[in-house]
A protein has these predicted regions:
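Short, glycine-/small-residue-rich phosphate/pyrophosphate-handling segment
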Residues: 99-142
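N-terminal beta1-alpha1-beta2 submodule of the flavodoxin-like/Rossmannoid cofactor-binding fold
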Residues: 1-100, 140-144
């Protein structure tokens, strides 16, 4: 049976994004990773953050899950900074750990966002859709709540 994980990308572990994630994970028994609890540095071409939590976390995700749901608040018309760092670090899978990155192909991705507005600005979903396409993943869709 396919397994799903929700990656909670909020700078606030117990805010509105957490409420959504908690509801979904309890009803569907999805596993959750709170990026706020992880030490994930920014991407750099020198691979200076090779020993942080990103690569072990990606090994766990790629090995154990078929579907990844990203949950993020809207910060300044975009995904949260903590989730953006995570997305930037996907470059590690294209440069330094290609064999791991290739295993993203065929997996599924979805996105949940929330803010104090009832809709998203144009372009918000583009990084999710484009990343899924580039990595050979199926983009299942997205939803926004407020």
């Amino acid at each position: 049976m396919p397994k799903t994980i929700i990656i909670q990308g909020s700078s606030k572990s117990f805010g509105n994004t957490h409420k959504i994630v908690k509801y979904l994970s309890s009803n569907e028994q999805y596993d959750v990773i709170d990026l706020k609890t992880k030490n994930i540095g920014p991407f750099d071409y020198d691979f200076a953050n090779a020993t942080d939590d990103f690569l072990p976390l990606m090994e766990k995700i790629i090995t154990n899950y078929d579907t990844i749901i990203f949950a993020t608040p809207v910060y300044w018309y975009s995904m949260s900074g903590i989730l953006k760092d995570f997305f930037d670090r996907l470059s590690d899978l294209l440069h330094y750990r290609k064999e791991l990155g290739r295993q993203m192909k065929g997996k599924r991705m979805a996105m949940i966002s929330n803010s104090n507005e009832n809709d998203l600005k144009d372009g918000f979903t583009m990084p999710f859709k484009a990343s899924a396409s580039y990595l050979g993943m199926t983009y299942l869709g997205d939803t926004h709540t407020w």
